[in-house]
Amino acid sequence: IQIGVVVEFLLYVNILTWPVAVVGWVTSMVQEAEASQARINEFLNEVPEIKNYNNESLEIHGKVTFKDVTFTYEDTNITALKNINFTINPGETLAILGNTGSGKSTIIELISRLYDVTAGSILLDDKPIKKLNLNEVRNQIGFVPQDPFLFSDTIENNIKFGKKNASEQEIIEAAKNAVVHENIIDFVHGYKTILGERGVTLSGGQKQRVSIARAIIKNPKILIFDDCLSAVDTETEERILANLEKVSKSKTTFIISHR
């Protein structure tokens, strides 16, 4: 066998190896894509259980009433709330304290209509919440969770998410009320600082305060704070609470704490 023939054979083998390898690679990708597409189709075909039965615009004042409210989670059959009754008017604050799993967050989820009650009724301004425009109701709720979600965007845009057309002065004012303005201006790019995934650029306390600013700037009729100061030191917490007392004077406020 001549050297040229051997070289020619090796070149042909090399040329054929890549296409054969690609066939196996593409086959694997197609199988993964089919599984992903099936999951996407399942998600897109999901029908929301909570439906909006009214598209009429309305003015919300913020009075919230629970009448004999009972709620049971269908998937676990656990009754989180049983015969709950209370009324809170605009300008009032309701503190909800309790151990983990006692139903504190369930109350908030029912007010936001993430779930509907199993029994009893919830009234907003003396009207059944189920019969009100769902979008209007949620637009008038400012919610600050314990574990805030921030986008991979600038701090400014994360705060403006609560109010898209907010002015620079409104953004700064909201940040000051949340006692995070001083931290923001310490960054090289200030409010233009781009955050990492889920806000990893900021500390836990800073993320919570940016989330508070986002809720405040929205100027909703109902404010909900779900243990949102758990990562903040005592001195800063006192300053924030003092500011929130001023901001929420005419609003219905819910404060949840595990303490």
What is the predicted role of each segment?
Residues 42, 49, 160:
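Conserved E/DxxT/N motif and adjacent residues on the DHp alpha2 helix
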Residues 1-10, 20, 30:
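A hydrophobic transmembrane-helix motif
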Residues 59-259:
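ABC-type nucleotide-binding domain
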Residues 15-43:
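Cytosolic ends of transmembrane helices, especially the final helix of ABC transmembrane type-1 domains
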Residues 49-59:
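Pre-NBD coupling/linker segments of ABC/ABC-like ATPases
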Residues 46-49, 189:
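Flexible, glycine-biased helix-capping/connector loops in cytosolic signal-transduction modules
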